[in-house]
């Protein structure tokens, strides 16, 4: 008898009574047949086509109904209003809302519905509905007591039941109230294998702080400490205290005593002191790193070279350009007492006497006189010429070779030379004799005193001549010369000139009958209207400079490409 009673109780538990409310009779019939003819034979469907009829049915069969499924759109009363009315009259019953509008899902769940079923219903939804209803029946349709509801009256998040993960799209929970009168409830699941609640371990309601816990123990927490804002006046007091005590001897207790601020505690000062020490350590580290990095920098970056530029007072000797052809490195002198080694060894030459900025490579040459005129051997004009040439330093040019004479560098009463051709420099010939007097006094009449061994022509007696300038004798028996000079004939009373390209060869012969050698001088032809070497003209004008070619290498004199490139650079 007892065994039969237990079997009956077990079978009664597996039987589920579901009430379906829908105003569409066709859908209601299909829905009822699907539930009844499913493999779950224990489901009994109560079909109702009107909301008010559903309320009357609940009055008669309240204890026999385990689950209510209602449509959202119905005449006279929608599904949410029906759910609210059922809650007011019959307590908390499980209600599922179904609708073809997916936008009603959130509203339904927020108003207390246990789940939402989209229309049309698929056959896969049937087992989920059965499991949902079975869970409620096994729990004995348990709801929270009145006391529990009163305690949770201020809780806005209802605890709702969710099915297994595959049923997540059917039943969802939202944390929102439908109205101020909606009841809240919590249903605890005992079948963990099938049902999980939103009030799981993560979302279980926390009891107020200081209230009784589940084991009866009260956990009292200390109040939170008040946060201290270190304002500027408070920070000034803190720094003054550190300065008074000393950074090495400072401790929080002494700082607190000196500051004498009532609301400060020792912990506040200790925390702030620790942060301050970390800040000081970081500043010191950055300072050391910057000092090590600046040690390798050039000293010119630490000087005021932009506002007060450096000036070179050295005598210009090779070129007025800032670099020579071979990029030889020179050092300039600072007028502010700084080191001369302001530039690196690879820095190009800045060898002029005008003020310039080290950071600006495009310097402009101003019209300035030399600062050390007493040491010059070549006249420097007070006004620069319009065109500046650069003397080559290849094979001694510029030091001992010919000066690059531009056609626009000669004025009426002065001549500009770019070669430092003094007798003190080593070389095969010194032809600055007779030039010093006219260069030092440009307005004086040029009357040179040639040396005893210099050979002159009677018609060119006022021109400075060079000694031992026989180019043919210096080259020996070389068969190839850069220019043919065999056609020049000696003449005692006049000079012969043959123009070959841009160069004029002048043959000066004094007396070949006496066995003396003739001198052949090659000079660049200048087309300036202000330059004239006619001896009959006024000798107060500037006289061109004659250069010596005898010291050059024979192979390079034979090379036409070398000579043409050299002449073109000098003439340009």
Swiss-Prot record:
Example of a GO cellular component annotation carried by this entry: nucleus
Chief site of localization: nucleus
SUPFAM superfamilies the UniProt entry points to: CheY-like, Homeodomain-like
Residues found modified as 4-aspartylphosphate: 71
Chain ranges for the short sequence motif Nuclear localization signal as given in the UniProt record: 224-227
Family: Belongs to the ARR family. Type-B subfamily.
Protein name per the record: Putative two-component response regulator ARR13
Gene giving rise to this polypeptide: ARR13
